[in-house]
Every structure is written in structure tokens, then in C-alpha cells.
Amino acid sequence: MSSFLDILGDGHVNFEKCGDVVVSPKDNMVAMFCHFCKDIFTHLPEFMRHLQWSHSDVLQFTKEQNVYRVEELMSLETSEDDVQSQANSCSSGDSGLAGEMEDADGEPGSSECLANNLEIMNALAAFDVDVDGLNNVSHEQSYSKTPPDSRTEGFRCARKPGRVEKPPSICDLKSYNITRHSRKREAIKQRLSSVKKRIMRSLENDVISPRLNKLRSKLNNSLSSNISGPPKQSKMPSLLENSSVNELPAVLESTNPPNFDSEQPYVVSTTIKPSIRPCPSRTAVKTDRNISHQPVARRSTVNIERVDILPPINIKQKMKMSAKDIPFWESIIISSVASQQPSELNTTNNAVDQPPKRPERRSSLTVISSSPIQAMKPMRRSSMTRENTSPESSGILRSGEVESPAKANKRTKDSFEETSSSNEKGNAKRSKLEQNRCSMNFSLSASVTEYIRSDLKTSKLDLDSILRLAEPLESDYFKNTIVEDQVKNATKMGSPQKEFTKLQIGVKPEMEALKEDLRLLKTVGLLVLKDSCFEDKLPFEQSESFRKTAAKFSKIYHTYDTIWSYRKTKTIGVHQRLTEQLNSFTEEVNREIDCHLTTNEIKRILNLINSWYAYQIDQRFFRKATLSYSVEHYMFLFHFLPKINPTVYFCECCEEIFPNEARYKKHVQSVHAVHAFTCSECGKSFKRLYFYEKHLKTVHLKP
């Protein structure tokens, strides 16, 4: 090959066009087109052999040329690329050494590359090719660029095969995942912010519902009469009549409040609410009818013209006050209640159906809401023996006529005199109240009367109707005695009620069952199952004896795992073998503890132990309760019992077993308990009459 290069440099080489390269992008193929025979070859070695064998006369080959495959020439280069890719994959990918490693690789035609391929070296040795000379030429070409020959300047050089793209490294994949998650978080934040803006916009532009507007209009209509304004013409005469001449100037004065006595307690309350009026200096807002304005809740300015303060009230003097000296505020309450129409009184009964309103401050003249006493007034002295209410007590509520102030004052005076009576009169009144079952069981004292008086400032009831509730009526007493006599006579003659035969219930009373359980538990030393603090009531020697007995019983119980393990009990499968185990366990317990217990009593003890142990496990591990020292000691004796898995409950009347306490109790209640209703034909018991009658109709076909 060195001689060929020398000839090429001397210019003695004849360049002959042998063929063209044909490319088919559709089929993804490259072929060589022979210029002499017009034939196409898909492989380069095949094309070279064709030229040597078929067109040697034209090309004038002096001897046979050796032709190598491209795969053989490129095998070493591909192996080096694989080694380089492995080195790059082992590195972090961010060190920046890939370019240096590519520059450090030798050229495919160098001596270092050819020396690794044995076949190429043998072929070169057959033709006496100098490898070192080739290496020097390659180095000279790498360091100094040879000027192109004028004869070969128009030809293109062979291209080096391009490198395959490297797969992404681990760091590249991690960075890609991080950026993808960050983009997702940003998208979620934008979506949430848009939803938040939409919610805030809907809250700002929310229109008040028609139901709320209706409630607000009702509230405004109810309060329109209470807001300050000119008083009604119908109530003014009654106010002027009831008020005395000396007290009117004190009420009409707006700036000079009355002098209060510092030694006596006093109560201050407003008689008139602050008047809410539009400001005169403010101009009215003009609105266009064609534009629909949305209602906006704003606070209007309050213009308070005057505030009147009531004079102080002396409780001792008011209790003994005569009818002529009734204070002005009491006459206002009486007149306002008397002037109410029946329609207005009936509206208070519907107050329960209305939605709750905002509580407002009470005033001495305004009626804001109905009192709970008023709602209970129609239910006064409700009893089965009473048929009609007395006309005296219900006349005030039913009649709409205005009562004269003199009669009202007289009735109020009588009620106050009765409350301040002597002890003998109070005892007689108390005995009279006890005889009447329908009346109240207490008498009103002066403090209670004053409290009721202050609490009824805003209600639509007067004080007299409340005081009459505590007084027994003679007519009611006679009516009650007559009805009681009729009931006694009816019971003596015999009522048409259904009489059912009373059967003795097989289940023992609770006290007897508890005594029986205590006796059984005392025998085996397990009183802690019923009383967790029983050791505190006993001396030390006796408590130690109980602990020793319980330890013996638990040791024997531990050996019979087929009794306390539900899984092993089910594997036995035959009730006879389980009965044999219980009998042997009973005999061993009687022999070790020196007692005389039956098999049913042993079953009862085991059921009590399982129920108590399950309850203590629930308290300790699930409810995190602190157990006493004695309870923990006895729990340790039965540590082998299952804590979560099902345990064994034995029926004391039959041979059935159950995995939990609920099924055991249901079985006893439905099968072995004798109830009040028992079928005479089949002997089945029923807890309720409905099921007994249904059983008779469906099973025995009885009407």
C-alpha cells in the first residue's frame, strides 16, 4: 500500500469512472451502478469483485486485488464506540469529558486500530505493507494538512460513518422529571387561583335570595311599629288616663333627668327607643327607573333626638302600693296588653314556625318577641281529668275588650296581698295545692313575683293571668274529685280491657342472678370480675388466698386449650368430645380447689371471664384507660386468652357454642328465655303481643 501511495503522489495513477451510487429513500437502500454493464449491486465487495472479474480488460488489472468487506473494516471502530459509550454511561454525564475522549480516539486507519484485528494484519503482511510507515503518514496528515492535488480537486472524499446518538443519562432523566413535576405544580396553582377568583367573584355578586328578602320585609314591618314615631291615637287616651299629673312632667322632660337617691338601689331603663330618621342635610339620591339597582346592605346614620330615663323603683314600697299610687310603667303595661286585639294575640302562636330572629334589647314599651310563658299558657294545668278551662282565667286572652284600669289595679293589688300573706295562710294554701293534682306545687314569693314582673315587660300577657296559674280553683277541685270517684267505681265494676294470663318468667331477677354470680366467682377467687376494688375492702391474708385460688384455676384453664380457643374448638367438630373436655375440666377444678361445681356453673364462670377480659382489653388498648394494679394482676393470669380473635361462649342450657357475646345473648334471649306471651299449642314464647298475635294468625290460623 505504501507503493500505491507513492504512485498516487507521483501522478502516475489513471482515474477511471467505474460507476455511480444510486440512493432509494423510499426503500431506504444504497446501491452501486456499474458504468460498463449498466448493472446495480447492493454491496460494495460484490461490486469490486464484479469490476475485477468482468471488466479487468478495460481497467487493465495486472494481478488479482484483495477485496475486504466494509463490515470487517468497521468492526474495530464499532467495538471502540461501544467501549466509549460504556465509559460515558458510567460517568455522571455532567463532567464534560465526552469531547476529550472523542479526540483521544485514534483514527480507524491507524496502526493501533489495525494491530488489534488479526485478519487485517495477516492480509497486510502478505503484501509487505509497512505498518509503521502507515502510522507515520497518518500522523503527518493529522498534524499538517496536505494541499489538494489539481487533478483530484474535483472529487469528493469518502465520508466517515456518523455516530449513533447516545441514550440520555440518568442525570438527564432526573432533571427531566423534576422539570415535568414543576410544570404540573405550576398548572395546579394556576387552576386553583382561577377557581378562587371565580368563588370570590360569585360571593361579591351574589344576589340576596327572595326568601331572605321576604324575611327582612317581615322583620321591618314588625319593627316599624316599635321604631320611634308619632304614637297611635288609640293608645294616647289610655296613657293619659293611667298616668298621674305629677308623673307626666318627669316623663316629658328630655334633658333634665330626675335625681336619684344614692342610698337606695335603682334600675334605669329607657321608655322610648332612639328614633332613626333620615338626616335633613343630606339630599335624596335620584335613581333612574330604567336601571335596575342591586340592593346593597349599608348602615344608615342614626339621629337620636332624645332619651327618656324612668324614675328609680323601690321594691319595698311598690309591694305595698295602693291602687291609686300604681306607678306609670305598670299602667302602661296593663293598658298596652288590654288594647291588643285577638288577631294580634293569635299571631304569637305562629312564632315557632318562623325562623329565629336576631335578639334585640328589651324596652319597657315595645313588644319584640313572644315569651316562653305565653306559649305555655294555653297548656295551663293540663290533665286528663279536666275538660274545660275556667272562664275566669281565659277571659283575658279571648276577649278583645279594653278592661278598665280600676279593675286591673284592684286585681293586681289582690295578687300582691296574697303573696305577702302570713305563714299560716301560706301553709293552708300549700296544703290546698297538694290536694289539687292539676295545679302547681309551689307558692310565689315576693322576689319571684318581682322577677316575673320584670320578665314580662315585653310579653303580651299581663301579670294577673300568670298569678292565677298558682291559685287552685274550687270548681276545679270539685271536678277532680267527681272524676276520681267515677274512675274508682269503673275499676270496681270491671273495665273491658284485655286480660292476659301472667306467666312466671324463667329468668331470675337481677339481684338473685348477681348473688349467684358472686357465689361462683368467690369459689374460684375471681371476685374482681364484678368488683374491681374488692381487695381494698379485705385484709391482706384473705386477698392473698383469693389470688392463690385464681392462679390455680387459670393454670388448669390454660391446659385445656380446646375450651378457650374457638379455632381448636371448631376443629373438634363433635359436641360429645367438647362435653367430655368440659367434664374433665370440671372434675380437675373440683379436685384442685376443693369445691363442688357443676358443668353449667363452670360454663357460667367461663362466660363471665371471657366477657370481663374482652372489656378490659378494650379499655386498655383501644380507649387508653389506666387500669388498677389488682385488675392488671388478674389480667396477667389469663394472658393466654385471645385478645382480638373470637373466643368461646357456652350456652348454659344447651350444647351450643358462640364466637362472641352478642350471639350468645341473642340465643339465650330468643330460645331459652320465657316471656310474657307463650303459645299454648307449640310452647313458643314471645316478648311482645304483636308477635304473639302474628304467630297465631300465620302458624295456627287463628283469628
Curated annotation (Swiss-Prot):
Keyword field contains Protein biosynthesis: no
Amino acid composition bias (Polar residues), ranges on this chain: 84-94, 138-147, 339-352, 364-373
Location of region: Disordered: 78-111, 138-161, 339-434
Compositionally biased spans, kind Basic and acidic residues: 148-161
Subcellular location field: Nucleus; Chromosome
Zn finger (C2H2-type) start-end: 32-55, 649-672, 677-700
SMART domains registered for this protein in UniProt: ZnF_C2H2
Keywords, alphabetical: Cell cycle, Chromosome, Chromosome partition, Meiosis, Metal-binding, Nucleus, Repeat, Zinc, Zinc-finger
InterPro entries for the chain: Znf_C2H2_sf, Znf_C2H2_type
GO terms of biological process kind: male meiosis chromosome separation
Cellular component GO terms held in the UniProt record: autosome; nucleus
A GO molecular-function descriptor: zinc ion binding
Record's keyword annotation contains Endoplasmic reticulum: no
Record's miscellaneous remark: Drosophilid specific gene duplication generates rgr and tef. Teflon has a function unique to Drosophilids.
Family to which the UniProt record says this protein belongs: Belongs to the Teflon family.
The protein's role, per its UniProt record: Specifically required in males for proper segregation of autosomal bivalents at meiosis I. Expression is required in the male germ line prior to spermatocyte stage S4. May have a role as a bridging molecule maintaining adhesion to hold autosome bivalents together via heterochromatic connections.
Record-given protein name: Protein teflon
Source organism of the structure: Drosophila pseudoobscura pseudoobscura
